[in-house]
């Protein structure tokens, strides 16, 4: 009876230890969010076949930008990718493995996958645009897929952002 009790305690402690070591979303935010978003875009038939998942991921990557684009590059989802560990994503996805576990496996293969971080979003409703750097103003326009033709001075960029703010501000709320 004592050995059974001791074995049960050891199993519980091992389970607790494993959950504390498990990868958290904030530790690998770009990977977890991208894998979740991609997985939710798949239909049931595609989810079951890892080859179809790989084809779908390559198609998905063509539309990605910024951090997600870099994530695709690291996995081999882009034509110009130097390496390819796409099967480390596709096979676990076909087994319905959670995004956190998939990213944990990917991190073991390539640690830089979890080095990707989203930049903090600028709250356009509360920020003073005059205090931002031109680089940040350009980034706001770039994130909106907008340009500022003929903008040379900081005031030109601010004026353009103010013009476009009503179109994009509803996304910021």
Swiss-Prot record:
GO terms for cellular component: endoplasmic reticulum; extracellular space; synapse. Disulfide bonds join 28-114, 31-103, 61-72, 148-151. Keywords: Developmental protein, Disulfide bond, Secreted, Signal. It is found in: Secreted. SUPFAM superfamilies: SAP domain. InterPro entries: ARMET-like, ARMET_C, ARMET_N, EF_Hand_1_Ca_BS, EF_hand_dom, SAP_dom_sf. Gene3D superfamilies: SAP domain (1.10.720.30), Saposin-like (1.10.225.10). GO terms for biological process: dopamine metabolic process; dopaminergic neuron differentiation; neuron cellular homeostasis; neuron projection development; synaptic transmission, dopaminergic. Residues 1-22 form the signal peptide. GO terms for molecular function: calcium ion binding. Belongs to the ARMET family. Required during the maturation of the embryonic nervous system for maintenance of neuronal and cuticular connectivity. Essential for maintenance of dopaminergic neurons and dopamine levels. This is Mesencephalic astrocyte-derived neurotrophic factor homolog. It comes from Drosophila willistoni (Fruit fly). The gene is Manf.
